[in-house]
A protein has these predicted regions:
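Short, charged/polar, low-complexity loop and linker segments
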Residues: 57-68, 107-110
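N-terminal low-complexity, charged segments
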Residues: 106, 116-119, 128
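Generic detector of short, well-ordered, non-transmembrane alpha-helical segments enriched
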Residues: 77, 122-125
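Residue-level signal for mature regions of secreted extracellular proteins and peptides
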Residues: 119-122, 144
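Short low-complexity stretches enriched in small and charged residues
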Residues: 41-48, 82-88, 104-109
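Membrane-proximal intrinsically disordered regions of secretory-pathway and membrane-system proteins
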Residues: 1-57, 114, 127, 132-133, ...
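Juxtamembrane inter-helical linkers in multi-pass membrane proteins
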Residues: 95-113
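A transmembrane-helix-recognition feature enriched in membrane-embedded lipid enzymes
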Residues: 62-101
């Protein structure tokens, strides 16, 4: 049964990769170019996008929306504090434990403000949402690695929205498995850091040779 579960997890990850490729291909139909590492559109596409831009008209904004704006944008303060807190946390703890730190830029992505069909208010909203969701995803991965290091055990009850590491955790009540393999979960994190450092070193050497 264990092999069957691991096979299903691998299949699920393959499907996720296929979905990402499908999303990228569909984005390409809208003229998106990611070859340079940044989202770019050609002149004709940008002109067409600007033609769909809506004017800002606060008088047409529903009053409940206007009343909730202080609550919405006020959340940037606790989100920024969480951003700082988890960054300091992983810098201290992950370094001490010898495991790979989470790359913030992989989770906090701010790019939707470049879209020509968004007006300034919409761009601000997109920056805010991108930052907020990115920080939460960033913090989630940090806490997921912490959970793998200290308590790689599934819950007895179903958990909605569990992180991707959770599926490989030990079953609830598997005392023998915890005693035998809990240290192996830590070693996986340490090996991941060693592999990441080796990859970074190889890339740096390749860039040096190219220069």
């Amino acid at each position: 049964m264990t092999d069957s579960i691991e096979t299903m997890i691998d299949r699920l990850r393959q499907l996720e990769d296929q979905l990402e490729a499908a999303f990228a291909a569909r984005a390409g139909t809208h003229g998106l170019d990611l070859k340079s590492g940044k989202p770019r559109f050609g002149p004709e596409v940008r002109a067409r996008q600007r033609g769909h831009k809506r004017r800002i008209d606060f008088f047409k904004t529903p009053w409940p929306t206007l009343l909730t704006m202080p609550l919405i944008y006020g959340m940037v303060i606790p989100i920024a504090l969480m951003d700082l807190a988890v960054s300091v946390y992983q810098l201290g703890c992950f370094t001490a434990w010898g495991i790979e730190r989470v790359r913030r830029r992989d989770y906090v992505v701010i790019d939707r403000h470049r879209l020509g069909y968004l007006n300034p208010v919409q761009k601000l909203n997109c920056v805010y949402c991108g930052y907020g969701n990115g920080v939460i995803a960033y913090a989630r991965e940090i806490t997921a690695r912490t959970e793998q290091y200290w308590c790689p055990i599934k819950h007895a009850l179903k958990v909605k929205g569990s992180h991707e590491r959770y599926a490989a955790f030990l079953d609830y009540g598997d005392a023998e498995g915890f005693v035998k393999t809990s240290e192996a979960y830590r070693e996986r994190l340490k090996k991941a850091r060693a592999a990441a450092e080796a990859k970074a070193s190889a890339e740096a050497e390749a860039e040096a040779r190219a220069e």
